[in-house]
Swiss-Prot record:
Lineage: Eukaryota, Metazoa, Chordata, Craniata, Vertebrata
GO cellular component: mitochondrial inner membrane; mitochondrial small ribosomal subunit
Protein name in the entry: Large ribosomal subunit protein mL66
This protein's UniProt keywords: Mitochondrion, Ribonucleoprotein, Ribosomal protein, Transit peptide
Species annotation: Bos taurus (Bovine)
Keyword flag GTP-binding: no
Gene Ontology biological process terms in this record: mitochondrial translation; translation
Length: 196
């Protein structure tokens, strides 16, 4: 049904374009999606509510730093994003989750590496669930091995975390985050700790 409507409206535009002459050049193009506003018109006892197409909006505003070498630098976002900003990160990734190359994104080398690290961290945190490569038909992925395979003698639920990983002056710390993001702005009073 939708295909029939598109065909009929396309033929109608084509015929209108032929009848009005060569002065109108927009008949061959599909209709542009403009912004619409709702207008109420009162005629006696009847109220007509119609949507009118308004003019197209202005182009995007000028960046605050037009001399920057990449989009992140131009919009002064250099140290102001993290792996949680998925709307920003989704502009630099492909539909299946991989990074777009620098020739397409226009990022400088430093920011490309930071965005790449943030995308990895967002994938690991489960913040980008829709960006996964599609599996071919009939292919079933292998089940992942359970993480605590070494605990086969007792139930995995009986495990307690290791609260004390050594003396305070000689603890074995776990790496968290990425050293590439160490210059990012911290909005809390605590300093950034890369080892917990």
């Amino acid at each position: 049904m939708a295909a029939l409507n598109v065909l009929v409206s396309g033929c109608g535009r084509f015929l209108r374009g032929l009848l009005t002459g060569p002065t109108v050049t927009s008949w061959a193009r599909p209709p542009a999606r403009g912004f619409r506003e709702v207008v109420e018109i009162q005629e006696g006892k009847t109220t007509i509510i119609e949507g009118r197409i308004t003019g197209t909006p202005k182009e995007s505003p000028n960046p605050p730093n037009p001399s920057g070498q990449c989009p992140i630098c131009r919009w002064n976002l250099k140290h102001k994003y993290s792996y949680e900003d998925v709307l920003l990160l989704s502009q630099f990734i492909r539909p299946h989750g991989g990074m777009l190359p620098r020739s397409i994104t226009g990022l400088c080398q430093e920011e490309h590496r930071k965005i790449e690290e943030c995308v990895k961290m967002a994938h690991r945190a489960g913040l980008l669930p829709n960006h996964r490569p599609k599996l071919p038909e009939g292919f079933f992925p292998k089940t992942r091995p359970r993480l605590n395979r070494y605990l086969t003698r007792w139930s995995p639920r009986s495990v307690k975390p290791i609260y004390n990983k050594g003396h305070r002056w000689n603890k074995v710390r776990m790496a968290v985050g990425s050293p590439l993001l160490k210059d990012n702005v911290s909005y809390t009073g605590r300093p950034l700790v890369l080892y917990h």
